[in-house]
Curated annotation (Swiss-Prot):
Pathway field: Cofactor biosynthesis; pyrroloquinoline quinone biosynthesis
Protein name: Coenzyme PQQ synthesis protein A
Gene: pqqA
Organism: Pseudomonas aeruginosa (strain ATCC 15692 / DSM 22644 / CIP 104116 / JCM 14847 / LMG 12228 / 1C / PRS 101 / PAO1)
Family: Belongs to the PqqA family.
Function: Required for coenzyme pyrroloquinoline quinone (PQQ) biosynthesis. PQQ is probably formed by cross-linking a specific glutamate to a specific tyrosine residue and excising these residues from the peptide.
Spans traversing the lipid bilayer: none
Keyword Ligase included in the entry's annotation: no
A Pfam family it matches: PqqA
Alphabetically ordered keywords of this record: PQQ biosynthesis
Swiss-Prot/TrEMBL GO biological process terms: pyrroloquinoline quinone biosynthetic process
């Protein structure tokens, strides 16, 4: 489990992008 804020932010951003792309 990574405790880096940058990694979490990047992952969240990627998920959001996929969500928007799926719309």
């Amino acid at each position: 489990m990574w405790t880096k804020p940058s990694f979490t932010d990047l992952r969240l951003g990627f998920e959001v992008t996929l969500y928007f792309a799926n719309r």
